[in-house]
Amino acid sequence: MAAGIVASRRLRDLLTRRLTGSNYPGLSISLRLTGSSAQEEASGVALGEAPDHSYESLRVTSAQKHVLHVQLNRPNKRNAMNKVFWREMVECFNKISRDADCRAVVISGAGKMFTAGIDLMDMASDILQPKGDDVARISWYLRDIITRYQETFNVIERCPKPVIAAVHGGCIGGGVDLVTACDIRYCAQDAFFQVKEVDVGLAADVGTLQRLPKVIGNQSLVNELAFTARKMMADEALGSGLVSRVFPDKEVMLDAALALAAEISSKSPVAVQSTKVNLLYSRDHSVAESLNYVASWNMSMLQTQDLVKSVQATTENKELKTVTFSKL
């Protein structure tokens, strides 16, 4: 134990000297090392099918260490969102949120397109033949359905792990609701985005009208897309800020999305997940409120051993991917 204490003190002194330097003799930094080697074990997750995720409408694989790949998996139906999908997405992302081995997620569509949106044939009975004896009861029934469908994409936004949408082909209707709940969006050159709901006689009600204005920051463009249901092609999506990168085809895009997820997963999970929480809070609150929130947040997060490990790697010119961070 004495040897361990001495080693910790030596590391603290080393970091303090490296960080402060001779130009700032009055600056002192207090760093603590906690935990044991048992807390720092590398993840033993095998690549391939994720055993805890078995679904009808989704396929979940361990694409790389700490990275899960979620595919919308109804290619013969253009990945249309049926009743099973709405339930399984909630189950899937609730599991991912609790998965200490997962640090980043990529979501894509199998087959020729990302998604055709809501499967109207499968869901017609819920929408066109709602249950209830009178207007009040029918209204409460429909409201319950709408809020449950909203939860399908809320769980993506709430997931503490960054979620990267990789879009090819059509991203129609509910697909726009889905990707606007993600943290990062990539697309292939053949992608297009379409707020389709107005063409089927309703207002989008599971996230697009609430999130898209904040994603692209252009209310006039949002109004145009929502009122007309016109297609937004890949280059326009890039110019508007809906996506951050466009790639020649699906294969190149998926490789890039998985590489990005791997890079994110190499960082401190405490830092990454804290960053996501604070970015979402800041989106919906004032600067003053958000600064106060992050101050309260970091009063505990600054005590993480991830800080010490990251600083040590930096001072020793090591890449962060060589650092083993504890599970979170």
Swiss-Prot record:
PROSITE patterns membership: ENOYL_COA_HYDRATASE
Protein's cellular compartments: Mitochondrion; Peroxisome
Subunit comment: Homohexamer.
Chain sites annotated for binding substrate: A116, G117, I118, D119, L120, G174
UniProt motif (Microbody targeting signal) ranges: 326-328
General function of this protein: Isomerization of 3-trans,5-cis-dienoyl-CoA to 2-trans,4-trans-dienoyl-CoA.
Family recorded in the similarity comment: Belongs to the enoyl-CoA hydratase/isomerase family.
Modified residues (Phosphoserine): S268
Residue list for modification N6-acetyllysine: K327
Protein's organism: Homo sapiens
UniProt-recorded name of the protein: Delta(3,5)-Delta(2,4)-dienoyl-CoA isomerase, mitochondrial
Name of the gene: ECH1
Gene Ontology MF terms: delta(3,5)-delta(2,4)-dienoyl-CoA isomerase activity
Its EC number(s): 5.3.3.-
